């Protein structure tokens, strides 16, 4: 089976072609970072309009690079949610329209299921079951995964997600958009300076996350300290360590609760070097293994949507012709594949 994947949930237009026998044949991505940089964050209306401009040329490019004709496709997968509703509808409209015009089955894919399954695109792919840490700009969650669609959300963010906390803290430090990667780069030049940053919600039972208080603590620290480059780097390091430690503590708890020894980390924050190193140490200490996608598939992309959609189309799942987007969509409501 060969599937065209379309991702437009936020500010990246991602298109890919995936074949269940040959693997990933092509993927094309357009990032809107420069478009939104002047505003310090994603402007939903601008994001939607840019998807409209870029999506068709990218589809043509992906099909050409995959040496794939319309007749070679067996289905179309597009991101149905969660995400920005205007951006979602661009991908949904194009995906459903092409499916109708080409007489192909189509399916709307859950964006976070795409991230969760992104490590399956690698040669060293995890086997079920495992615990997944999904960390992005909009989500932070721990999920018990026993198969595709067999998900139990063990904990999630009650306010700011980890990626959102990175971006907001970067803005407090005067760093340009996108702030998360820039903060991590600044933190790499920092040194331990005795800051006592909290590890939110680790002093109580449970697996939920909260990062809004940590952001406020950082803001107060910035205001009280000298405004020089090294001090900012030291604060950035302390903040990053606090976020990573918090995620690691919660992962240990989730692994102990489930008894699993495989951990998947995915989503934009999974590209963070300190997070990867820390979780690798955690898994080594318990005789387990950590899995994550390559850097280009940590952020939003069409490859993960094509892969996830192919699994569901191959299992016989189909949707009607209605164009639908779901800005909010609980992961654990997805039907399982047996």
UniProtKB/Swiss-Prot annotation:
Cellular component terms (Gene Ontology): cytoplasm
Single GO MF descriptor: N(6)-L-threonylcarbamoyladenine synthase activity
Disulfide linkage: none
UniProt-annotated location(s): Cytoplasm
EC number assigned by the record: 2.3.1.234
Catalytic activity: L-threonylcarbamoyladenylate + adenosine(37) in tRNA = N(6)-L-threonylcarbamoyladenosine(37) in tRNA + AMP + H(+)
Root EC class: transferase
InterPro entries assigned to the protein according to its UniProt record, in alphabetical order: ATPase_NBD, Gcp-like_dom, KAE1/TsaD, Peptidase_M22_CS, TsaD
Function of the protein: Required for the formation of a threonylcarbamoyl group on adenosine at position 37 (t(6)A37) in tRNAs that read codons beginning with adenine. Is involved in the transfer of the threonylcarbamoyl moiety of threonylcarbamoyl-AMP (TC-AMP) to the N6 group of A37, together with TsaE and TsaB. TsaD likely plays a direct catalytic role in this reaction.
HAMAP family the record matches: TsaD (MF_01445)
NCBIfam families: gcp_kae1 (TIGR00329), T6A_TsaD_YgjD (TIGR03723)
Protein name in UniProt: tRNA N6-adenosine threonylcarbamoyltransferase
Species whose genome carries this gene: Shewanella putrefaciens (strain CN-32 / ATCC BAA-453)
């Amino acid at each position: 089976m060969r599937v065209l994947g379309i991702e437009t949930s936020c500010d990246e237009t991602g298109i890919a072609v995936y074949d269940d026998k040959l693997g990933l044949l092509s993927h094309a991505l357009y990032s809107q970072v420069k478009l939104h940089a002047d505003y310090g964050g994603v402007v939903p209306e601008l994001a939607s309009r840019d998807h409209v401009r870029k999506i068709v040329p990218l589809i043509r490019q992906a099909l050409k690079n995959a040496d794939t004709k319309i007749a070679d496709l067996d289905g179309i997968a597009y991101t149905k949610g969660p995400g920005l509703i205007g951006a979602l509808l661009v991908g949904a409209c194009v995906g459903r329209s092409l499916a109708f015009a080409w007489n192909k089955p189509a399916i709307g894919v859950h964006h976070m299921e795409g991230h969760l399954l992104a490590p399956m695109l690698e040669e060293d792919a995890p086997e079920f079951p495992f615990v997944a840490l999904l960390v992005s700009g909009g989500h932070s969650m721990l999920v018990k995964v026993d198969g595709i669609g067999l998900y139990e959300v063990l904990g999630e963010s009650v306010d700011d997600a980890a990626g959102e906390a990175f971006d907001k803290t970067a803005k407090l430090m005067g760093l340009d958009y996108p702030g998360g990667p820039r903060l991590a780069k600044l933190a790499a030049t920092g040194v331990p300076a005795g800051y006592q940053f909290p590890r939110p919600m680790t002093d109580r039972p449970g697996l939920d996350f909260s990062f809004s208080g940590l952001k406020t603590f950082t803001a107060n620290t910035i205001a009280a300290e000298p405004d020089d480059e090294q001090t900012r780097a030291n604060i950035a390091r302390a903040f990053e360590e606090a976020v990573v430690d918090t995620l690691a503590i919660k992962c240990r708890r989730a692994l102990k609760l489930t008894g699993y020894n495989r951990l998947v980390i995915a989503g934009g924050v999974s590209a963070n070097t300190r997070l990867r190193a820390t979780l690798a140490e955690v898994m080594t200490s318990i005789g387990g293994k950590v899995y994550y996608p390559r850097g280009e598939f940590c952020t939003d992309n069409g490859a993960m949507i094509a892969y996830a959609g192919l699994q569901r189309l191959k299992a016989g799942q189909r949707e009607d012709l209605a164009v639908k987007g779901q800005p909010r969509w609980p992961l654990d409501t997805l039907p399982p594949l047996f």
